[in-house]
């Protein structure tokens, strides 16, 4: 048995081995050929000592950057006290985080879980319970947008309006229908058709800005009317704020960008600053869960909640919301300048705050993943949001000088494709 284990171990890669060496990790990601070992602020280092400017931040997750002093201190203290207990008992760190969230949002109560997909699963269950209890619907329908992304679990991916994510996993969970994002006429026609014979729609689940779907910002006029229609029909309006929430868009919450309030919204990513936590936040009238309706073993554990509360208070203490607005404007201005200087390659810029997308020309012969790959040569980390959008989601602490470096390295990357 020992020889067999040694044989297995020798077949797999290790730190310092070739980045393309086989590993025991399942191949669910098409990984870049880079092994990252440490980080500080907006910078990360690989196993060869190369330094990269990180405009990915764990995909909009490391709000305070890497190895943040306040996070290290608070989490070190928490590990000395209590790391995990069951939700069968009261958890002070969980209650403190919930209090902060409801004091600083439109919500009245919070359910904690471990990820964005889990938060959206909870939202889907909440929507169905609302449909059954409040609207008397036997088979509730949830409306979501084309090009949306709500997670990789089965119900969340069924809610995702991108058929390529469905392939190979059929049958999808029933009860989802899709409409064109920001298209009010199409939405109203679909809603009227579905409601013509009586109540059938329980909720609308929608991103204020579509991240994975191409960095598509919501239009305020569309969302205002969406809010009116949902209220008129007693339909829950649920925002997926997994990527835009916790200050990334230049406000605490994406709904503030649009001037309306949802009945519920979901969070994850930046909430934990790099630690696994998700949340469903609801207004009082949408708080329908009862004991036994939903649960999470690890959701809201003391360690994760301590991390999230530290992130929230550090964003406040450092005035990062205003800085995100300033740095976002600086980044957008620089990206707009690149569009003007690379007209054959680039089409435009879109996004909010420090969630910006550089849109490639439709006829360009290269893709956003090609750009992300080439950026590694310039020691820059960026990611794709679909085939034609290069996405930048740096830590919220990024400095003006680092924005300038990001733009310089991105320009050098684009020169590969002239």
Curated annotation (Swiss-Prot):
Pathway: Amino-acid biosynthesis; L-arginine biosynthesis; N(2)-acetyl-L-ornithine from L-glutamate: step 4/4
Single Gene Ontology BP annotation: L-arginine biosynthetic process
Residue(s) carrying N6-(pyridoxal phosphate)lysine: 269
Residues that hold N(2)-acetyl-L-ornithine according to the record: 152, 296
Keyword terms of this UniProt record: Amino-acid biosynthesis, Aminotransferase, Arginine biosynthesis, Cytoplasm, Pyridoxal phosphate, Transferase
EC number(s) stated in the UniProt entry for this protein: 2.6.1.11
Binding site for pyridoxal 5'-phosphate: 116-117, 149, 240-243, 297
Note: May also have succinyldiaminopimelate aminotransferase activity, thus carrying out the corresponding step in lysine biosynthesis.
Recorded family membership: Belongs to the class-III pyridoxal-phosphate-dependent aminotransferase family. ArgD subfamily.
Annotated protein name in UniProt: Acetylornithine aminotransferase
Source organism of the structure: Prochlorococcus marinus (strain MIT 9313)
Encoding gene, per UniProt annotation: argD
